[in-house]
Regions:
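Acidic beta-strand-to-loop metal/phosphate-binding motif
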Residues: 120-126
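N-terminal accessory/capping or targeting/presequence segment of soluble
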Residues: 9-117, 128-172
Length: 172
């Protein structure tokens, strides 16, 4: 696993990935892009294929979200990951949002704040939870903002990406 993580950063840098993401956002009419930690099954242990937040930000934490605008970006981490996040995003433009700390907006509040009037927030509908999407939409309503589902992660992360899991499902 560590070898794969190193490959991420040899291939190109976080600033280059953010530039590519911003270009794709612009091409798709997206003002803000949200990358949550998640997969289509809301798995507790994330398959490597769905580590898009790590790929674009360099941060390896759990229970996180990453928001990118044309001019800024921020990653949310809970208390277990404050020190790790500081180290992993050091030297980048990415702002660390310490979840639960006084004065720190939730990811939903932040999306509502940075989205322009009548703006469009993009996210991959496969990885975002229903609760997250509803919370974000509630914040966007004040600005008449909309959510557009598109998968810029698949479009941009084409080299060295682990395959989607092909393991059998278990009926519980």
């Amino acid at each position: 696993m560590e070898e794969r993580r190193l490959f991420f950063f040899i291939m190109n840098t976080v600033p280059e990935r953010l530039a590519a993401l911003r270009a794709a956002m612009k091409a798709n009419g997206v003002d803000v892009y949200l990358i949550p930690v998640g997969d289509p099954h809301s798995s507790e242990y994330l398959p490597d294929h769905y580590t898009s937040l790590t790929y674009f930000s360099g941060f390896h934490g759990e229970n996180s979200n990453f928001v990118v605008t044309p001019t800024e970006s921020a990653v949310w981490a809970d208390g277990r990951y404050f020190v790790q996040a500081e180290k992993e995003i050091a030297g980048t433009e990415i702002q660390l949002m310490r979840m639960g700390e006084p004065g720190v907006p939730t990811v939903e509040e932040y999306c509502g704040k940075v989205l322009p009037e009548n703006g469009v927030l993009g996210l991959c509908g496969l990885t975002a939870s229903c609760g997250l999407v509803r919370g974000v939409q509630k914040e966007l309503d004040a600005k008449k903002g909309t959510i557009k589902t598109l998968n810029l992660e698949d479009e941009l992360w084409t080299e060295g990406r682990p395959a989607r899991p092909a393991t059998p499902a278990w009926i519980l």
